[in-house]
Amino acid sequence: MIIKEKIFLGSFGSFVKVVVDIEREIISAGCELHVDCAEELITDGSLYVNLWGANVYPKDKKIDFISLMNIRPADNNRSMDIENPVIKKRVEDIIKKLVF
């Protein structure tokens, strides 16, 4: 499900996989795998380079930035965590704007 306006993710359960397009400031949420959410956004016009995975815990209003799709040695991200603080902050801000 692509999210372009504020929504409450509580109906998805206690844990929701999301992918954030940091350029378009939209989210895809609720997919079984982060890559499925990424495909949804790419089909909608997003570029993979702008997509970053995270996990949202709506009840606790918590975010973790762990996803296999975040491993990008070519972009200096060698971990499942988002290592670039600017990108991480952007992902966090977009999630907070659209979810919390």
Task: Identify the role of each PLM range.
Residues 33-57, 62:
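Amphipathic, interaction-prone secondary-structure segments
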Residues 17, 49, 86:
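Short, well-structured alpha-helical interface segments that form or flank functional binding sites
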Residues 15, 19-22, 65, 91, ...:
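Generic structural hydrophobic/aromatic packing signal, biased to beta-strands
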Residues 29, 36, 44-45, 66-72:
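Surface-exposed loop/turn and secondary-structure junction residues enriched for glycine/proline
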Residues 85-100:
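Well-ordered alpha/beta subsegment
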Residues 58-82:
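Intrinsically disordered, low-complexity regulatory segments enriched in Ser/Thr/Pro
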Residues 1-40:
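Negatively charged, low-complexity tracts enriched in Asp/Glu with abundant Ser/Thr
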